């Protein structure tokens, strides 16, 4: 009974925190924010792609490529696969998620459509809660999962991830327009 009460209390606390968004710290994000992966910067290890909606790509890349981790700057955009994206809002936007917002997208040659966005409630195409997984990352990784960052392994292989990345339909449309 005590364990259940603690679990329920923690869940209520987290849900309460997920709603603690400071609108003045929120970045403007809409469907046009999300670009073809090849228009973003690939990290040195090639594991994921980054961008920065505020133009601070050098600082975002420095943290993404750091062997020691660090805190990503506001505006950072992180994407492992085309349909899953994290965006870092201004400091103080949402303490529970270290100012990250999670997005599940539908992507096509026409662009991106936001299916779901939020803090602790977004679920990906595999049925996993984005925040639930990313919160397992050790503090120095700023909620970014990697093979040695403390997160549970993904249910798909690296080869499958690369195939999904290479198949971003938004990029195919750009290539055929050229």
Language-model features: locations:
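Bacterial N-terminal signal peptides
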Residues: 5-13
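Sequence context surrounding c-type heme c attachment/ligation sites in exported
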Residues: 22-45, 69-178
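Generic detector of short alpha-helix boundary/capping microenvironments
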Residues: 4-6, 63-64, 121
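Bacterial Sec-dependent signal peptides at the C-terminal "C-region" and cleavage site
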Residues: 15-22
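N-terminal post-signal-peptidase region of extra-cytosolic proteins
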Residues: 54-69
């Amino acid at each position: 009974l005590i364990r259940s009460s603690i679990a329920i209390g923690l869940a209520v606390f987290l849900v309460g925190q997920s709603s603690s968004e400071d609108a003045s710290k929120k970045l403007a994000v809409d469907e046009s924010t999300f670009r073809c992966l090849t228009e973003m910067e690939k990290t040195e290890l090639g594991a994921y792609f980054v961008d920065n909606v505020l133009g601070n790509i050098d600082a975002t890349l420095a943290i993404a490529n750091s062997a020691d981790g660090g805190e990503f700057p506001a505006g950072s955009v992180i994407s492992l696969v085309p349909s899953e994206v994290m965006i870092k809002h201004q400091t103080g936007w949402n303490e529970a998620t270290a100012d990250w917002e999670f997005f599940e997208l539908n992507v096509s040659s026409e662009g991106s459509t936001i299916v779901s966005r939020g803090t602790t409630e977004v679920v990906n195409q595999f049925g996993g809660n984005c925040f639930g997984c990313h919160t397992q990352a050790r503090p120095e990784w700023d909620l970014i999962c990697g093979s040695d960052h403390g997160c549970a392994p993904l249910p798909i292989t690296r080869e499958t991830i690369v195939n999904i990345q290479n198949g971003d339909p938004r990029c195919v449309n750009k290539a055929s327009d050229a």
